């Protein structure tokens, strides 16, 4: 029996490679989002610590109050920057997810096509084998007669 060779095997492997590449990109984006969320949490803690540093005192200088206001503004700007970065990463992740969905569909199509070609191959091989068996049987019958 002949060996089955799928004529689109190289294309299928390339599609698998692209699919794995996109999966890796998505996981890297997830890691970056987690990192940004961690930065956001630490920034929130820093904001609270900054606010609480003044609340325990009974006497506060105006310069300290102005300084704390500037610190709060700066922390707010950093928070906005991190939030916009997270939104941007989520947007990129969404596009990558759509690409992954498309690549998965393409991969599945090629797998289905391979199964169909394999079934056709088996059918042809069975027909060839049946012809050989019939030939052997007719030769054996001809010798006996």
Task: Spell out what each predicted region is.
Residues 1-145:
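Charge-rich amphipathic alpha-helical interaction elements
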């Amino acid at each position: 029996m002949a060996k089955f060779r799928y004529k689109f095997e190289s294309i299928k492997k390339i599609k698998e490679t692209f699919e794995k590449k996109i999966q890796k990109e998505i996981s890297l984006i997830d890691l970056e989002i987690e990192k940004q969320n961690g930065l956001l949490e630490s920034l929130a803690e820093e904001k609270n610590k900054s606010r609480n540093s003044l609340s325990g005192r009974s006497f506060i200088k105006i310069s300290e109050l102005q300084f704390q206001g500037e610190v709060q503004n700066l922390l707010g700007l950093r928070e906005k920057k991190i939030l916009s970065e997270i939104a941007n990463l989520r947007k990129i992740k969404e596009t990558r997810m759509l690409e992954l969905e498309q690549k998965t569909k393409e991969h599945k199509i090629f797998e289905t096509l391979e199964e169909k070609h394999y079934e056709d191959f088996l059918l042809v091989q069975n027909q060839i084998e049946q012809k050989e068996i019939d030939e052997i049987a007719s030769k054996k019958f001809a010798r006996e007669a």
